[in-house]
Amino acid sequence: MAKPVVVEGKVVADTGYWAIWFIFKNQWYDIGKFYDRSGNWLGYYCDIVKPVSKLLADRGRTIKLTDLYLDLWISAENKISILDENEFVEAIKKRYISKRTAEEAKNRLNLMVEMVRSRKFPPREIRRIKPLNDLEPLLGKQ
């Protein structure tokens, strides 16, 4: 990693850190659950994206994911940080994102923030995952 990612003064991604990434069909977000080198959970990084309509394109090897530049960090303490707003505004100015899509992205972000505050986001299934307990059996490391 070229340089650490810092949110609110705390390193959330760096060399040796890792994440489990979740992509959802027909949703306006994806979620990365981030851990430090020691396996301590740091929080969730959520990209606002155009909804993915097919998760198994190209025989399961690839998917098309369109990042809309607007991101949300949810710390382990449930503190919310909206990220990359400058990139989002610039993308609208350069017409990388239509005004209609930008408006929907902003609405979805606001909805996610409200859901975080009411403890309804991220989805319960994502919150429950404990990687060393839940994922090793799936990888054949029992």
Predicted regions and their residues:
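Catalytic core of tubulin tyrosine ligase-like
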Residues: 1-39, 44-62
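Amphipathic, alpha-helical segments enriched in basic
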Residues: 6-9, 21, 63, 76-80, ...
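Glycine-centered secondary-structure boundary/capping sites
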Residues: 16, 60, 95-96, 119
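Detector for Asparagine
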Residues: 26, 40, 78, 86, ...
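Extended soluble regions of mature proteins
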Residues: 27-33, 42, 66, 103, ...
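Conserved, surface-exposed functional patches that form binding/active-site neighborhoods
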Residues: 41-95
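Compact, glycine/acidic-enriched structural inserts
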Residues: 89-90, 95-107
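Cysteine/selenocysteine-centered motifs that mediate thiol-based redox chemistry or coordinate metal-sulfur cofactors
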Residues: 108-142
